[in-house]
A protein has these predicted regions:
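Conserved ABC ATPase "signature" region
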Residues: 37, 52-70
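Conserved ABC ATPase signature
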Residues: 74-78, 82
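Catalytic Walker B motif of ABC-type/P-loop ATPase nucleotide-binding domains
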Residues: 99-102
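Short loop immediately C-terminal to the Walker-B catalytic DE motif
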Residues: 105-106
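Helix N-cap at the start of a conserved alpha-helix in ABC-type nucleotide-binding domains
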Residues: 110-112
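H-loop/switch region of ABC-family ATPase nucleotide-binding domains
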Residues: 135-136
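H-loop (His-switch) and adjacent beta-strand-loop-beta switch element
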Residues: 147-160
Length: 181
């Protein structure tokens, strides 16, 4: 347990979460629009319906994730990459401050993986959303992250440049594709 030393921290409704996909999630029988809108539930309080602002937020999130054309489709009929975009759009409805992503590209093919990383990078650089990502993809972490927390036999936290000079980072050769411990 720690203490917040500066500022007031973030409230739970200021953090969007993208969980690692499970078999149960992949077969969820709801329309894309409904799933994206569900990211607004924290804003509704005791109100049973979404308001215009929340509906617009969902439309905007679907546009950012380039899934507007899928709004009426059933989630379980989508490809893995499309499903991840839907879940990321849902997380965007929850917050514009911080996203916590748990293995966001797990199980995706290389082309879709690259597209997802590009979308995530754009959210960070253009929209100013802080992204904390859990990943076993060390190459992507080195390529996209400003800071890296490496937890293995030893722990490292610091900038990308410092990581590459650290004992943990030197075990991973980015130019060769590498392999992390």
């Amino acid at each position: 347990s720690g203490r917040i030393l500066t500022g007031d921290g973030l409230r739970k409704n200021e953090i969007g979460y993208l969980p690692q996909q499970t078999v149960v999630q992949k077969d969820f029988p709801a329309a894309v629009r409904e799933i994206v809108l569900s990211g607004c539930l924290g804003r509704c309080g005791s109100r049973p319906f979404y308001n215009k602002e929340e509906k617009k937020l969902a439309v905007d999130a679907m546009e950012k994730m380039q899934i507007t054309q899928l709004a009426r489709r059933c989630y379980r009929e989508l490809s893995g990459g499309q499903q991840q975009r839907v879940l990321l759009a849902r997380a965007l409805c929850a917050t514009q401050k911080m996203l916590l992503l748990d293995e966001p590209v797990s199980g995706l093919d290389p082309k879709v993986t690259a597209e997802m990383y590009t979308l995530i990078e754009k959210l960070n650089r253009e929209d100013g959303i802080t992204v904390i990502m859990i990943s076993h993809d060390v190459a992507a972490a080195v390529r996209y992250a400003s800071h890296i927390l490496h937890i293995g036999d030893t722990v490292f936290f610091g900038t990308r440049a410092d990581y590459l000079q650290s004992p943990q980072g030197r075990l991973f050769d980015v130019k060769k594709g590498g392999d992390s411990q």
